[in-house]
């Protein structure tokens, strides 16, 4: 190559080494702070380190000396999509694409002067393909659950069934009736039974495209492959539960006052249950915050103070769901009203019709991923 050609290659290598390093660091931050995934974070850091080692085969001062940012015509070429990112997944998608392309450029132009360098970059590139795949799939799973959650209207709580066939039938009738989220709640069975039904329910729910939540038991939620866990004010703190279930799964938290709602927004909870609204048959309480509490929650949503989906709970059925809707809440969690009976489908559809009159302020666009722990 001529001196001019060699200098051009150095410019290309310098630009793409910077681009690949920046992309890898962006992805490392996502694995570290969004997913809290130690393995992915370590692997991305290793890729970044391996790239730095490979670049040592080139004289750093020659690389820097070849750099001509003011004279680079490419710095002024931009597209509209480069200036915005729809959500965190789009940040990751852009970074993986940019990194892969930069590595390929390093490999191809490196072949003109150093075949061993090119081979090193090729190895890094293939390792990155595997890492990036895992990273994007984990982000996709996290986003899919969050999107389903914020679009949900009807949440049913059920107990364990006598056998697998009964559980399949129970889930099927709820899904067919328009239920979006199903929680398995049963303190009367042993752990093995709860786990087996939780695992079966998780598989069925995934097939039917509904969310499957386990009450109280974060360990069983993880072991069974459930979408999340719901805890009360007396159970493990939300941030401790997050340590168990990881960033991919949803966490719901029961709240009984506007003060507890405000505290919930400072945790990594994904949604809240608000109540009890009315007296019900499954649980008894000393006091019922009622629709006055729901109005406070709705006001908090309207003001932007609350950015978590809120489900009214407690004694709600077709006969009183209108009061919930008038409070400004368009999501409910139900037990008795959706217990097996001949009119279950009509009850669920009737409740849903009323709830859908209430606009959802917490939308997929405003809550694309689960809340993240503080850095």
UniProtKB/Swiss-Prot annotation:
One BP annotation, GO: thiamine biosynthetic process
Positions of 2-[(2R,5Z)-2-carboxy-4-methylthiazol-5(2H)-ylidene]ethyl phosphate binding: 315
Keyword Magnesium tagged: yes
Catalytic activity: 2-[(2R,5Z)-2-carboxy-4-methylthiazol-5(2H)-ylidene]ethyl phosphate + 4-amino-2-methyl-5-(diphosphooxymethyl)pyrimidine + 2 H(+) = thiamine phosphate + CO2 + diphosphate; 2-(2-carboxy-4-methylthiazol-5-yl)ethyl phosphate + 4-amino-2-methyl-5-(diphosphooxymethyl)pyrimidine + 2 H(+) = thiamine phosphate + CO2 + diphosphate; 4-methyl-5-(2-phosphooxyethyl)-thiazole + 4-amino-2-methyl-5-(diphosphooxymethyl)pyrimidine + H(+) = thiamine phosphate + diphosphate
Region (Thiamine-phosphate synthase): 128-375
Name of the protein in question: Thiamine-phosphate synthase
Cross-referenced NCBIfam families: PRK02615.1, thiE
Positions contributing to 4-amino-2-methyl-5-(diphosphooxymethyl)pyrimidine binding: 183-185, 215, 254, 283
Binding, Mg(2+): 216, 235
Xref: Gene3D superfamilies: Aldolase class I
EC class of the enzyme, as a word: transferase
Gene Ontology molecular function: magnesium ion binding; thiamine-phosphate diphosphorylase activity
Native organism: Rhodopirellula baltica (strain DSM 10527 / NCIMB 13988 / SH1)
Cofactor(s) essential for the protein: Mg(2+)
Unknown: region residues: 1-127
Entry's cofactor comment: Binds 1 Mg(2+) ion per subunit.
Record's keyword terms, sorted: Magnesium, Metal-binding, Thiamine biosynthesis, Transferase
PANTHER family noted in UniProt: THIAMINE-PHOSPHATE PYROPHOSPHORYLASE (PTHR20857), THIAMINE-PHOSPHATE SYNTHASE (PTHR20857:SF15)
Domain of life: Bacteria
This protein's encoding gene: thiE
Family named by the database record: Belongs to the thiamine-phosphate synthase family.
Purpose: Condenses 4-methyl-5-(beta-hydroxyethyl)thiazole monophosphate (THZ-P) and 2-methyl-4-amino-5-hydroxymethyl pyrimidine pyrophosphate (HMP-PP) to form thiamine monophosphate (TMP).
Gene Ontology CC annotation, any one: cytoplasm
Pathway: Cofactor biosynthesis; thiamine diphosphate biosynthesis; thiamine phosphate from 4-amino-2-methyl-5-diphosphomethylpyrimidine and 4-methyl-5-(2-phosphoethyl)-thiazole: step 1/1
Record Pfam families: ThiD2, TMP-TENI
């Amino acid at each position: 190559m001529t001196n001019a050609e060699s200098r051009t290659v150095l410019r290309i290598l310098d630009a793409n080494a910077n681009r690949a390093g920046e992309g890898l660091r962006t992805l490392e931050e996502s694995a570290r702070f969004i997913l809290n995934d130690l393995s992915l974070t370590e692997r991305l850091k290793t890729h970044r380190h391996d790239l730095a080692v490979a670049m040592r085969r080139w004289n750093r001062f020659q690389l820097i000396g070849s750099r001509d940012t003011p004279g680079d015509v490419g710095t002024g070429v931009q597209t509209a999509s480069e200036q915005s990112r729809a959500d965190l997944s789009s940040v990751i998608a852009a970074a993986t694409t940019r990194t892969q392309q930069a590595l390929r450029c390093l490999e191809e132009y490196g072949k003109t002067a150093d075949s061993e360098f090119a081979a090193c970059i090729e190895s890094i590139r293939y390792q990155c393909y595997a890492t990036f795949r895992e990273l994007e799939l984990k982000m996709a799973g996290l986003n899919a659950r969050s999107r389903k959650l914020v679009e949900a209207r009807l949440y049913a709580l059920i107990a364990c069934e006598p056998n697998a066939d009964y559980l399949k039938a129970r889930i099927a009738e709820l899904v067919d009736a328009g239920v979006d989220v199903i929680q398995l709640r049963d303190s009367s069975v042993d752990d093995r039974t709860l786990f087996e039904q939780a695992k079966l329910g998780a598989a069925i729910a995934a097939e039917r495209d509904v969310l499957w939540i386990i009450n109280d038991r974060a360990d069983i939620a993880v072991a069974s492959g459930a979408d999340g866990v719901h805890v009360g004010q007396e159970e493990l703190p939300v941030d401790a539960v997050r340590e168990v279930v990881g960033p991919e799964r949803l966490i719901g938290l029961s709240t009984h006052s506007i003060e507890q709602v405000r505290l919930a927004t400072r945790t990594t909870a994904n949604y809240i249950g608000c109540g009890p609204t009315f007296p019900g048959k499954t649980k008894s309480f000393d006091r019922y915050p009622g629709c006055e509490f729901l109005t406070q929650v709705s006001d908090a949503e309207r003001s932007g103070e609350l950015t978590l989906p809120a489900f009214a709970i407690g004694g709600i059925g077709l006969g009183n769901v209108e009061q919930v809707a008038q409070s400004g809440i368009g999501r409910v969690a139900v037990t008795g009203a959706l217990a097996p009976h001949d009119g279950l489908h009509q009850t669920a559809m009737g409740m849903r019709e009323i709830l859908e009159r209430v606009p959802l302020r917490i939308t997929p666009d405003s809550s694309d991923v689960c809340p993240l722990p503080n850095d």
